[in-house]
Amino acid sequence: MYAVVRLRGQVNVRYTIEDTMKMLRLHKVNHCVFVPENPHYKGMVQKVKDYVAYGKIDAKTLAEVLENRGRLEGDTRLTEEYIRENTDYDSIQAFAEAVIEGKSSLKDIPKLKPVFRLHPPRKGHAGIKRTVQQGGVLGNHDENINVLLHKMR
């Protein structure tokens, strides 16, 4: 599962890239979505790589994002009780592990908003005009996306 975080704004962005961002539900800066690893989403993420950071997320980080930034309709927080009542899992951590293994999906939580509004990273970005290979934060982070998401918790 990929975590995709929008890091750059929408001024002077080509129409096709902005349209792809809308399809990914990344309308604003510091918004995050989780998408499955399939060729369709991989192509979409590759198209917007100069405006987002993405990588493979682990269960611990997914649980942290769900707990801190997970919101239900009506802007209420996602809680352990809600997970227990509405899914087959006892905790957010157990649910996150099932999602990473592919046994479950984020859509299994009723009324969960698909977009996570993150905080700007503590201690700042390394630079939003450069890719990871050049010393910035844009593009493919692989496993290091977990570090960025922890900074943006």
UniProtKB/Swiss-Prot annotation:
Transmembrane segments: none annotated. This is Large ribosomal subunit protein uL30. One of its GO terms (molecular function) is structural constituent of ribosome. Signal peptide: none annotated. GO terms for cellular component: cytosolic large ribosomal subunit. It comes from Methanosarcina acetivorans (strain ATCC 35395 / DSM 2834 / JCM 12185 / C2A). Keywords: Ribonucleoprotein, Ribosomal protein. Belongs to the universal ribosomal protein uL30 family. HAMAP family: Ribosomal_uL30_A (MF_01371_A). Part of the 50S ribosomal subunit. Pfam families: Ribosomal_L30. Coiled coil: none annotated. GO terms for biological process: maturation of LSU-rRNA from tricistronic rRNA transcript (SSU-rRNA, 5.8S rRNA, LSU-rRNA); translation. SUPFAM superfamilies: Ribosomal protein L30p/L7e.
